[in-house]
Amino acid sequence: MGVGNEQFLRAMIPHHSGAILMCRQAAITDDEIVKLCRQIEKSQQAEIDQMKAILASY
């Protein structure tokens, strides 16, 4: 049986949060990776906000 809408969102929020946390805690010195992490933080946070809004509508 597949994962439903709500279960999917509830699993993805911590997954995205983990990516943000890894970027913030990593000892990154490569400028390209630093830039990538900034993009990851911005996009993943926006997606977390969107998923929370969708969950709130259920």
Regions found by a protein language model. Give the residues of each.
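His/Met- and acidic-residue-enriched segments that coordinate or traffic transition-metal cofactors
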Residues: 1-58
